[in-house]
């Protein structure tokens, strides 16, 4: 609920008492417009008044003579030159701000080990397209959806690829339980219980308890409408489950926890034909660090060459344990789910696509006769099980749920975009075919309402309300 958690304030309070934090207080005497924010922050983080006063007094003793000397020495020459450069004042001020920003964000951090690791993270975030923010990375994809839809003379043509699947063909924002419902009788579909706010609170608690008793803990708690793991919880006890169910402000579902490796499969069927094939398979890798008995979890994150690329995310996910020294040999998984949004790595694994897997996924997809394009989240005990076609489906996505190939840094950018573009074309072709068969088009307003509901969420389960 709050932007800043209490345990985060405690962690930052410790930092403010460190030499680096004390240096910030001293430097506020020298940087214009920084004193008031520094004083307020020091108060919020409970820095003692005697220490704060002593630091400011020492800074004043250093700064005041220097300021007076600079004013008396450089003041008269500056005032003589001021009229000549007055017309460039705006550019000079902008340049000064740019210099200050560059100095504080790049030069100052480079003076410490952690700062240099932060620079590594920043440089990778700029240079590796797979690490770009989603709104930038997927902008060409969204423009492609619009352009291809206009080519088929209907802006929502893609939503007709899967008639009667969910409310909007399985597009972003469709209810998860509705997309899973056609497949529930298949043993390869993860056991799921949908609970609506239309039911009474006691009914929801009773049904949830019965589900947990049947399938055991942990169970997975998910909002009906969410993307990229937003709002997801792993529930380990009956007390946690009851608290979540009673506090729910939206429809949600419970799922049996399925261990094993996690994969993402994009599947298509050619319009008007009884076929089907896998277009892409992505393996969701865990990001792990191993303790040495000396380093804290935060230090291990900054040390690891993989984890450092998304260090800020992992620091938020594990905010409570950052100062804990990890015992030697103990492995810590940094991503808390298989979602990229929670830190998992995405790897294209075309070598895992076998004839058996292709046939098994196609057989599963045909449980819903109108399905032409879908993305399935799979769990398998091993790579061999997956290649043999033995898996459990935990989620189903419909139209325009393209694969996470763009998040695979090992692929050339042009290759991953070409693959995603091919998936979009397959989805649009199916939608256009169904429209020619007189399928009712999905209203644009309903499509946008669903999309905005899913994208409007800001709760990342790893840093949201505590359990």
Pin down the residues of each PLM region:
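Membrane-interfacial helix-loop-helix
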Residues: 1-47, 51, 75-92, 105-114
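Active-site nucleotide/adenylate-binding loops and adjacent lid/helix of ATP-dependent enzymes
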Residues: 50, 164-165, 175-312, 354-358
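ATP-binding N-terminal substructure of ATP-dependent carboxylate-amine bond-forming enzymes
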Residues: 95, 99, 103-186, 197-206
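Hydrophobic residues within alpha-helical transmembrane segments
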Residues: 27-31, 54, 58, 62, ...
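ATP-dependent carboxylate/phosphate-activation module, predominantly the ATP-grasp catalytic core
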Residues: 268-367, 397, 402-427
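Transmembrane alpha-helical segments of integral membrane proteins
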Residues: 65-77
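C-terminal active-site "lid" helix and adjoining low-complexity regulatory extension at the edge
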Residues: 381-467
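A short glycine-rich, hydrophobically flanked beta-strand micro-motif that places a catalytic Asp/Glu
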Residues: 256, 263-266, 371-385
């Amino acid at each position: 609920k709050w932007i800043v958690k209490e345990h985060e304030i405690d962690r930052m309070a410790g930092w403010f008492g460190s030499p680096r934090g004390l240096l910030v207080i001293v430097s506020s005497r020298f940087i214009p417009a920084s004193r008031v924010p520094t004083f307020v922050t020091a108060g919020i983080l409970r820095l003692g008044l005697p220490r704060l006063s002593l630091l400011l007094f020492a800074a004043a003793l250093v700064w005041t003579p220097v300021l007076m000397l600079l004013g008396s020495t450089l003041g008269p020459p500056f005032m003589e030159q001021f009229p000549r450069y007055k017309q460039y004042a705006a550019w000079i001020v902008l340049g000064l701000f740019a210099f200050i920003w560059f100095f504080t964000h790049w030069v100052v951090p480079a003076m410490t080990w952690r700062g240099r690791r932060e620079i590594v993270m920043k440089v990778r975030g700029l240079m590796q397209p797979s690490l770009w923010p989603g709104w930038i990375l997927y902008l060409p994809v969204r423009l492609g959806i619009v352009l291809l839809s206009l080519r088929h003379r209907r802006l929502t043509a893609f939503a007709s690829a899967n008639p009667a699947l969910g409310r909007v063909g399985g597009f972003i924002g469709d209810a998860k339980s509705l997309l899973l419902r056609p497949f529930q009788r298949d043993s390869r579909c993860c056991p799921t219980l949908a609970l609506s706010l239309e039911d009474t609170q006691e009914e929801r608690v009773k049904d949830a308890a019965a589900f947990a008793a049947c399938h055991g803990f942990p169970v997975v708690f998910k909002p009906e409408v969410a993307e990229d793991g937003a709002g997801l919880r792993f529930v380990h006890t009956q007390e946690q489950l009851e608290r979540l169910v009673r506090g729910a402000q939206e429809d949600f579902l419970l799922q049996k926890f399925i261990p094993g490796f996690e994969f993402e499969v994009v599947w298509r069927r050619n319009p008007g034909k009884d076929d089907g094939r896998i277009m892409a398979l992505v393996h969701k890798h865990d990001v792990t660090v191993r303790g040495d008995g000396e380093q804290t979890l935060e230090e291990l994150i900054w040390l690891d060459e993989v984890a450092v690329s998304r260090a800020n995310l992992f620091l938020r996910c594990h905010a409570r344990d950052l100062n804990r020294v990890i015992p030697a040999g103990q492995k810590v998984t940094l991503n808390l789910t298989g979602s990229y949004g929670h830190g998992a790595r995405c790897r294209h694994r075309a070598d895992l696509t076998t004839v058996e897997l292709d046939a098994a996924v196609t057989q599963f997809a045909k449980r819903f006769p109108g399905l032409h394009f879908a993305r399935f989240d799979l769990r398998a005990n091993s790579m061999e099980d997956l290649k043999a076609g033995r898996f459990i489906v935990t989620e189903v996505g419909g139209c325009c749920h393209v694969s996470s190939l763009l998040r695979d840094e090992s692929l050339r950018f042009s290759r991953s975009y070409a693959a995603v573009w091919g998936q979009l074309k397959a989805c649009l072709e199916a939608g256009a075919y169904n429209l020619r068969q007189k399928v009712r088009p999905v209203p644009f307003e309903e499509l946008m309402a669903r999309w905005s509901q899913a994208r409007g969420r800001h709760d990342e389960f790893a840093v949201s309300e505590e359990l």
